[in-house]
Amino acid sequence: VSLAIQLPPRDDQQEFNLRAWERLLADADLAKIPGSFETDRHGHIIMTPPPGYQHGGRQFEIGYLLRKILGGNVRTECPLSTLDGVKAVDVVWLSDFRESSALKGNVLIQAPEICVEVLSPTNTPAEMEEKKSLYFDAGAGADEVWFCEENGTMRFHSPSGPIQTSQLCPDFPPSIDL
């Protein structure tokens, strides 16, 4: 049995994502609900509870270290338009050059150079593989996707596969200790 999913052309999906995201941001009732929001490729809202204490701490520490080591632009819970809707990336790093072309309104339409996901107990390997693929594919595509395991261990990926250390930020530590 094979399954084929018909996705709309990239530009159409991008415009659809931006409209869906603007509607989501304009909803006063949703603004009162704590947590993180994403959309799927059909514009449906996907809600997740606020991150736990350790998760938030690791997000902050990763962002702090990226800013300290690389400078540039760091954001957390950053909306990124992908072929599967708007995803909230835990931590992103963008150069000034990438930011100037990637930002459209309140959403990135091109992936930042570095996208980081801090893993939670509910994340599945399949879900993380899917996000990694989406980030490498979004707009100009991420240069690297990082994962921070629940124990703080960092895993780094380039579009061609796992890498021992980040090529963009080789001084980044192999583990985030809180």
Regions from the language model: what does each represent?
Residues V1-L178:
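Gly/Pro/Ser/Thr-rich low-complexity, intrinsically disordered segments predominantly at protein N-termini
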